[in-house]
Amino acid sequence: MIKQRTLKNTIRATGVGLHSGEKVYLTLKPAPVDTGIVFRRADLDPVVEIPARAANVGETTMSTTLVNGDVKVDTVEHLLSAMAGLGIDNAYVELSASEVPIMDGSAGPFVFLIQSAGLEEQDAAKKFIRILREVTVEEGDKRATFLPFEGFKVSFEIDFDHPVLRNRTQSASVDFSSTSFVKEVSRARTFGFMRDIEYLRKHNLALGGSVENAIVVDEDGVLNEDGLRYEDEFVKHKILDAIGDLYLLGNSLIGEFKGYKSGHALNNQLLRKLIAETDAWEVVTFEDASTAPISYMRPVAAV
């Protein structure tokens, strides 16, 4: 049986919020079967919980924000991408502020944290959402689509009219049956253009952003001294974001996601449309792991 997974141990980290610039303490904790991923604002009394579900998404400008009443958690997508990539079904994410720390701008540090905590299988079947037919949302020339696929595949195309990106790969397709999330996607960093950063800062966004946690691009090239981690790091980061946004379904997917210039808002619209169209998907479990179209790395012992 493919079983649900949680963390073996509690683990902590410190970072800054990308948009707020505030110092944030992050604690990842094991959670019982069928809990899902639940964010907790531990700085509030009483503590406020926000389950990582599509229905709880509020703001989608520049990042994905979860809300519960007037309480929010910003920039959840990179951590959720790491949870999805490692197959974590159940965990508590405690925060000392309203934003998940940006770390280095990728999912890599979160993958390291989760692997350091160790993974533990639980005594219940892992639930997958299998896509049964095409579901699409469009907005202007942007598009996001789910398609049936025996496995998990993410295809993405971006179209930035910028001298640096025009000459680089702006599309990628990753089939996770043959490609490692950890090696090929998790280290892709968020990116920003110098021309936008002043505008963002005027609106109290990207206050914690720097070349330490993003790829910064001006008219002449990439400003980061070490350059890019992947030749197609820009579009790979969009794939990383999409995987995090899709995990707000609450389960791992069996299907293909295709995005054309899609972002957090359109990704969330697609999830809401899918959830509403109950004939477009089904929940499945696998008694025999060898029959599943998706496999996960064996749980690793805590470091």
Curated annotation (Swiss-Prot):
The keyword Translocase does not apply. One of its GO terms (cellular component) is membrane. It catalyses: a UDP-3-O-[(3R)-3-hydroxyacyl]-N-acetyl-alpha-D-glucosamine + H2O = a UDP-3-O-[(3R)-3-hydroxyacyl]-alpha-D-glucosamine + acetate. Its EC number is 3.5.1.108. Keywords: Hydrolase, Lipid A biosynthesis, Lipid biosynthesis, Lipid metabolism, Metal-binding, Zinc. Pathway: Glycolipid biosynthesis; lipid IV(A) biosynthesis; lipid IV(A) from (3R)-3-hydroxytetradecanoyl-[acyl-carrier-protein] and UDP-N-acetyl-alpha-D-glucosamine: step 2/6. GO terms for biological process: lipid A biosynthetic process. InterPro entries: Ribosomal_Su5_D2-typ_SF, UDP-acyl_GlcNac_deAcase, UDP-acyl_GlcNac_deAcase_C, UDP-acyl_N-AcGlcN_deAcase_N. GO terms for molecular function: metal ion binding; UDP-3-O-acyl-N-acetylglucosamine deacetylase activity. The active site is at H264 (proton donor). Pfam families: LpxC. Zn(2+) binds at H78, H237, D241. Its cofactor is Zn(2+). Catalyzes the hydrolysis of UDP-3-O-myristoyl-N-acetylglucosamine to form UDP-3-O-myristoylglucosamine and acetate, the committed step in lipid A biosynthesis. PANTHER family: UDP-3-O-ACYL-N-ACETYLGLUCOSAMINE DEACETYLASE 1, MITOCHONDRIAL-RELATED. Belongs to the LpxC family. This is UDP-3-O-acyl-N-acetylglucosamine deacetylase. It comes from Pseudomonas putida (strain GB-1).
